[in-house]
Amino acid sequence: MSLELSDVKRLSTLAQIELTTEQSAQTLDKLNGIFALVEQLRAVDTTGIEPLNHPIATMLPDLALRLREDVVSEANRRDDYQKVAPATQDGLYLVPKVIE
């Protein structure tokens, strides 16, 4: 896949970014370079290769990841906070409508 200058101009318009002709050409080269790398990655046969959890896992198979237990460290004080809120409903805070 490769882009053309018209694609870059359309993308810059959609993103509301003003680019000069020179900047558009540079951006085109960079984007086409990225797409070329993606195509190279797609060409690699990864059949039978397990995904990695950690990039060093292949070099150090006994590596133990330092993960802590997922435990609650604070009390649930939602009811206390909602008592002083101006308006709540079903555990949610009600706010005035700001967009018509």
Swiss-Prot record:
It is an enzyme of class 6 (ligase). Its EC number is 6.3.5.-. It catalyses: L-glutamyl-tRNA(Gln) + L-glutamine + ATP + H2O = L-glutaminyl-tRNA(Gln) + L-glutamate + ADP + phosphate + H(+); L-aspartyl-tRNA(Asn) + L-glutamine + ATP + H2O = L-asparaginyl-tRNA(Asn) + L-glutamate + ADP + phosphate + 2 H(+). InterPro entries: Asp/Glu-ADT_sf_sub_c, GatC. The keyword Isomerase does not apply. The keyword Zinc-finger does not apply. Pfam families: GatC. Heterotrimer of A, B and C subunits. This is Aspartyl/glutamyl-tRNA(Asn/Gln) amidotransferase subunit C.
